[in-house]
């Protein structure tokens, strides 16, 4: 029996990257899955996992739209009954300097990375409170709260906000049996990382990923499945005394000094 057997998990942004990695990992640990994404392609991932013997429901929704979220969750609960675990993973990143970034691009980050998390959490939380049991995993980043890079001001702003939201919700709903924890990944080999690499160097994006890896003490980018294992831990009873925490998974990328004077 897996650590998540008998639990139903809603994962947003589940189609690809970290979200897909979490979905596959949760399935392996026995969870029933509700996979939410803005793309109808999410049905294919759900069909694949169902074909492998996992219980899985796909719902299409735009996390920016509370009505869309509410309708999707209603459909999912009609099939799955309840939601024990929420993984707020849906997120975006577009590079652009602070002065050059348009208001539309700024709001794009805020609407998905902050308001989207707010909307989904607000839709799921009341049921968890009524049962006095729930686990919420927030996808933040090392970018924003711990480190920063040029061109990622909007992204850093929103991911730092998720840390604050995590801690606030953890305090506010601890006595309701709700645990809320954040994951702060470093570089993960995902379509988002590949998109950042293309924006940085359209002619040779792979070289950007190679340089990223060289700057990491473990000398590689994370696999989404590794982030999935951390999420599974936070969603399981193994982390029963953890709430309001920031869990860094970055291969040591935030450890080195900018300029080393060591050996």
Swiss-Prot record:
Active site annotation, chain numbering: 155
PANTHER family for the chain: 3-OXOACYL-[ACYL-CARRIER-PROTEIN] REDUCTASE, SHORT-CHAIN DEHYDROGENASES/REDUCTASES FAMILY MEMBER
GO MF annotation terms: oxidoreductase activity, acting on the CH-OH group of donors, NAD or NADP as acceptor
Similarity annotation: Belongs to the short-chain dehydrogenases/reductases (SDR) family.
Name by which UniProt lists this protein: Oxidoreductase UcpA
Binding site for substrate: 141
Keyword annotations of the record: Oxidoreductase
